[in-house]
Amino acid sequence: MSASAVGQGRNVVVIGTQWGDEGKGKIVDWLTDHAKGVVRFQGGHNAGHTLIIGGKKTILRLIPSGIMRESTVCYIGNGVVLSPEALFREIEELESAGLQVQNRLRISEAATLILPYHVAIDKAREARRGAAKIGTTGRGIGPAYEDKVARRALRVQDLFDPKHFAERLRENVEFHNFMLTQYLGAEAVDYQQILDESLAFAPRLKPMVADVSAELYAVNAAGNNLMFEGAQGTLLDVDHGTYPFVTSSNCVAGAAAAGAGVGPGRLNYILGITKAYCTRVGAGPFPSELYDNDNPARQDAVGVRLANVGKEFGSVTGRPRRTGWLDAAALKRSVQINGVSGLCMTKLDVLDGLETIKLCVGYELDGKRVDILPRGSDAVAACVPVYEEFPGWNESTFGVKTWDALPEAARVYLKRIEEVVGIPIDMVSTGPDRDETILLRHPYQVA
């Protein structure tokens, strides 16, 4: 719905504060009641947002989560890398379920296209790395961003000039085929096939293409609220994450301005989503890790329990997630980088029944105490976590809707997290459905 206040609407950015998979999709869906539009501003179809609505599970990879609400307009900003094939596959899935999508989806003409050679390079590189692989989803996200930075990328708007598109595509195919065949030892891609398939998408895309930046400004100026939906998480950010074990885009709150074409002064509130514990998919350092399905040395019983009770499997890849205790020192880093206004704690109910709960509040690194996640993967890998222990609770927190109804031990745990990171917890998610939520401060109403 529209903002009730006269004048410019309020804007909320929802970002993950960990390594992704924090439960952003449910919270975005919950907040959509208060927003006219929902905006994706980075990433591609490598991130799956899982929604449970009326007991039905829906996984969105590219289209903003607001599409589940009939009155909401969804935007894909210029910072997104767009696979037309993946887009229309997702549209068809949603429309087959009875949702109207294409008349409510607006796509930036400046969004970078993911084309088949990006996917081929992504997969060939991972195969060549062998045991040293980064853990990419193999969907062409990284290579597409590489082309964007190198200024050779093809964008959505290029599809509508077939001659220009064909010329640019030929140059790109020649370049990438050299990499595929001469360096990666993979098969070449076919220029004509890519050209024909790409141009076939043009008339289907065109009705949805817009000057997203200008539309967002106009919608906001008319007094309507907007929400900016981040993908992945801060610790996977290409600049601020555990590099090189990161994604290929900026997934911090600041990227919402550049990736959607809005002024940073228009971002009123930053909501940081964090689980009550930590998970990570793929390779990379993880100081508070307890369980890794692929590592026999990481089979702690509590970690296994977190994975099973929390159903920790990637929504896009299906890969088992690594699990560990909540790392408040890493969370503090994310809070500072993003300028987080308030936190939303998700999956608190997964901790129900644990006798003891540990919270990482810092590290021992090179003989010194460190209270915030250091920069660089080597330093993070060398960190020995420093824990505080809390008594668990036997009462169920599942579906609890008020703060006072939480077990006292759970409230003590959450309050300590607030103290360590220095900002309030404004929301607590106690189950997958949108109404299984404790609201302490409303992101659209915080002064």
UniProtKB/Swiss-Prot annotation:
Pathway: Purine metabolism; AMP biosynthesis via de novo pathway; AMP from IMP: step 1/2. Its main location: cytoplasm. The keyword Heme does not apply. Its cofactor is Mg(2+). Substrate binds at residues 315-321. Disulfide bonds: none annotated. It holds the Pfam family Adenylsucc_synt. GO terms for molecular function: adenylosuccinate synthase activity; GTP binding; magnesium ion binding. One of its GO terms (cellular component) is cytoplasm. This is Adenylosuccinate synthetase. It comes from Cupriavidus metallidurans (strain ATCC 43123 / DSM 2839 / NBRC 102507 / CH34). The gene is purA.
